[in-house]
C-alpha cells in the first residue's frame, strides 16, 4: 500500500478472521484458462489458476467449504451489456468455454452459474454461506478488475470478513 493511503489511516486496523472460513472461486472456467478460446491465452491468468488449484487442495484437505461459479447465458437477451466481444459470442450454456477448469473444479464444491459480475448478485450464494456458517471468505478468480472486484464489494457489503488472495486472482492487465 502506498504511503499516501497509510498516511490517511488505511490499514490502521485489521478485520482478522472469524469463526469459519470458506473459499470463493470466481469464473475459473475454460474461457479464461484454455488457449482455444479468445480470452484463454493469458499467462498471468494461468499462474493465478495454478496457484488457486494449490490453495484449493489445502482448503479441501482442511474441510473448508468451497463455492465456485462460472458465467453463461441462454442468449444475448438475458446477458448484461458486456463490452467484451468474446463474452457476447461464446458465453452460452453448452459452449465448451463455460465448463469449469478441471484443475480447479471438484464435484464436492458448491458450483453454480452466475449471470452478472458478482458471485452474489441474484444467486444462491448468500443462502449457502449462511447455511455453512461462514463469516470469512477467501476470494480467488478472474478477472480481478471485474468479477472478483464485484464479488469482494458484495461480500464486504454482506458483512463478511474478506481476504483477497492476490496470487490466486488474475486479470488481462497487470497491476
Model-identified regions with their sequence ranges:
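Hydrophobic beta-strand scaffold residues
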Residues: 66, 111, 162-164
